[in-house]
Regions:
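Short, Lys/Arg-enriched N-terminal segments with co-localized hydrophobic residues
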Residues: 1-7
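A short beta-strand-turn-helix
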Residues: 11-28, 70
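Conserved Rossmann-like nucleotide-binding pocket used by diverse enzymes
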Residues: 8, 34, 60-62
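Conserved redox-active cysteine motifs that mediate thiol-disulfide chemistry
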Residues: 33-47
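Conserved helix-turn-beta segment immediately C-terminal to the redox Cys motif
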Residues: 26-28, 45-64
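Alpha/beta-hydrolase fold active-site loops
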Residues: 28-29, 82
Length: 114
């Protein structure tokens, strides 16, 4: 749908960066817990990119490789991936587990926001 713009999805590589990007963020932020070997995670990549282009002015989009930051995945009890968590002012609001089609993903995010 959107061509030319590069999506702004921040990759988180440390607990400190997580605190900067999510915990201390005012407003909505989203984190995608994923792994390179996960097929459904790879299916969600373009869905996330398009969602960021649509909702990027309302939600700060981030992603975490669970193999790189296992302790952070443990902190949020990530049992299945992809797991996508929506935060508001650093507090978890809601989460989605598994791959979701584009329209449904954007619709669910819009419904999760106030």
């Amino acid at each position: 749908i959107f061509k030319g713009e590069k999506p702004m999805i921040t990759e988180i590589h440390s607990n400190e960066q997580f605190d900067t990007e999510i915990t201390n963020h005012k407003g909505y932020s989203l984190i995608d817990f994923w792994a390179t070997w996960c097929g459904p995670c790879r299916m969600m990549a373009p869905v996330m990119e398009n969602a960021e282009k649509v909702l990027g002015d309302k939600i700060h989009f981030c992603k975490v490789d669970v193999d790189e930051l296992q302790d952070l995945a443990g902190r949020f009890d990530i049992m299945s991936i992809p797991t996508i968590i929506l935060f508001k002012d650093g507090e978890e609001v809601n989460r989605m587990i598994g791959a979701v089609p584009q329209e449904e993903f954007i619709s669910q995010l819009e419904n999760m926001m106030d």
